């Protein structure tokens, strides 16, 4: 395993202020946000939770533009370090995801990723 992926025993010190807040009964906002723009997918993987009897489930969800952009703005306002676009399908099958990605980068999240790939 490379050093990049090895657990760092002192990593907890990077979040010491958050741990102190929790011990005081406070609930700090998450630093990693996962936004699921869509559960639509162009694949039919056998192991997928959204596949039933070899076919995609018939409930398709795409976040509306206003909700998607509000989620990104909220994450940035609350100092998210990572905004990750993923979900039960391909995030880019929601036509508003590109706009949301651009907004996330404009609002200065430290990292933005989609489908497991940093952008």
Question: How should each PLM-predicted stretch be described?
Answer:
Residues 2-119:
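Conserved alpha-helical substructure of the radical SAM core
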